[in-house]
């Protein structure tokens, strides 16, 4: 260790040769900061903790789109009306969360630092499948708490610069990444959202059409799942929608999402069950 390093007062572990994983570095130097170590054990009754609900992902020719409703529930109560469930992971990937809100947000922050840490040490970016596996390792570390009901099951999506396509990855509670072919939904309203996606999805969707499909899917989920929020026109709370393309991550402007959502709500006044898929 140099005199400069000693002057900084950092432990020797910070200068030990290791892998490019920030999670492993944190495990060695400050394990108490990992999300898995910040939740009490299961020896006491678990209180109602806010849970995020429904998220969807759709592939389209230019890339991939993620969307989520804005509600978090705590037992039978609405804990938050404007929760952000879609987040940037890095320049060409994004993650949407369903499950225990506090742990999910910690995992997303950890993933963001993990990807940045790897890039700084290796002077190269991880491949998209590599990023998906890194998130899987973070989820796997939470398995003990998932078995107590504190599960986090995100959807990871991004643009594969090598293959030139958007990709969607879903996970089980053990952290195993599985690629979804065209679309995916997670959370309590996912069965209803997935049903809408099956009927409305087409491989040749434009970005505007993909956004409309996501809003329709979340609307259907909100109709049948009490934990999923529909559009709140009075409070101007609309779904969060983001895209990842060759140009990078982009969150759709709130005004654009508002106009799209209002058009969907207006159309539902004429056809409450939503658009009908053509038989072809």
Curated annotation (Swiss-Prot):
Propeptide: 1-52
UniProt GO molecular function: threonine-type endopeptidase activity
Classification via CDD domains: proteasome_protease_HslV (cd01906)
Keyword rRNA-binding (UniProt): no
GO BP annotations, alphabetical order: modification-dependent protein catabolic process; proteasomal protein catabolic process
Active site residues of this protein: 53
Gene3D superfamilies per record: Glutamine Phosphoribosylpyrophosphate, subunit 1, domain 1
Activity regulation comment: The formation of the proteasomal ATPase ARC-20S proteasome complex, likely via the docking of the C-termini of ARC into the intersubunit pockets in the alpha-rings, may trigger opening of the gate for substrate entry. Interconversion between the open-gate and close-gate conformations leads to a dynamic regulation of the 20S proteasome proteolysis activity.
Catalytic activity: Cleavage of peptide bonds with very broad specificity
Protein name as annotated: Proteasome subunit beta 2
Lineage of the species this protein comes from: Bacteria, Bacillati, Actinomycetota, Actinomycetes, Streptosporangiales
């Amino acid at each position: 260790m140099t005199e400069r390093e000693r002057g900084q007062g950092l432990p020797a572990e910070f200068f030990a040769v290791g892998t490019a994983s920030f999670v492993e570095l944190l495990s060695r130097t400050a394990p108490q900061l990992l999300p898995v170590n910040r939740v009490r054990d299961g020896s006491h009754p678990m209180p109602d903790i806010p849970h995020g609900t429904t998220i969807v992902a759709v592939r389209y020719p230019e890339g991939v789109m993620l969307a989520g409703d804005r509600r978090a529930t705590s037992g039978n109560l609405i804990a938050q009306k404007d929760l952000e469930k879609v987040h940037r992971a890095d320049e060409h990937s994004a993650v949407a969360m369903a499950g225990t809100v506090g742990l999910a947000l910690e995992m997303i922050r950890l993933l963001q630092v993990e990807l940045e840490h790897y890039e700084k040490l290796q002077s190269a970016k991880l491949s998209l499948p590599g990023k998906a596996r890194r998130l899987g390792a973070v989820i796997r570390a939470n398995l003990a708490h998932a078995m107590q009901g504190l599960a986090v099951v995100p959807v990871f999506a991004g643009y594969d610069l090598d293959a030139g396509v958007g990709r969607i990855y879903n996970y089980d509670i053990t952290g195993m990444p599985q690629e979804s072919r065209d679309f995916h939904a997670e959370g309590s309203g996912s069965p209803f959202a997935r049903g809408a996606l099956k009927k409305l999805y087409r491989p040749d969707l434009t970005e505007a059409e993909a956004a409309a499909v996501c809003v329709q899917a979340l609307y259907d989920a909100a109709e049948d799942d009490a934990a999923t929020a529909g559009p709140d026109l009075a409070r101007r709370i609309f779904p969060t929608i983001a895209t990842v393309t060759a140009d990078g991550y982009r969150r759709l402007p709130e005004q654009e999402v508002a106009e799209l959502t209002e058009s969907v709500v207006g159309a539902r006044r004429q056809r409450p069950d939503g658009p009908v898929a053509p038989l072809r």
